[in-house]
């Protein structure tokens, strides 16, 4: 009630309880254009901090009637912006935006025994990886971006050219050639 008495707008959001906090946690946040925390809110009243938000997987879209996928060589395009520019100028495609692309972030997970493994997360090209969300997604692991040493140990992972398929075969995935876990973030 103190926020109301002080005239401060606030939202109660679902939050990550952390390693010691138990299974449920809520935070009181005051919407502001500045600050370090982000949250989402639905018209139906659901509100959650970005690291604690849960969403349903999107419904599968039918590919029936769509043209077959085509692979394009994209030399020198190591960023989403350069892929978009290349697609719009060199390939004669309709107006492509970063939201039409998929980028891959390579994360290193270190467990309590200091065993390090990699995971590749695909997310829409117009979005950034939320560090807190990544930490919550992999409980029990220290999570950080893959290092140059990680890339050197995995020569199949070439910055700017990482994808689930390589040379027509499944490359990413625990049962694929690389044995590197592969996840998609649908939000």
Regions found by a protein language model. Give the residues of each.
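Extended, low-hydrophobicity, polar/charged segments
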Residues: 1-187
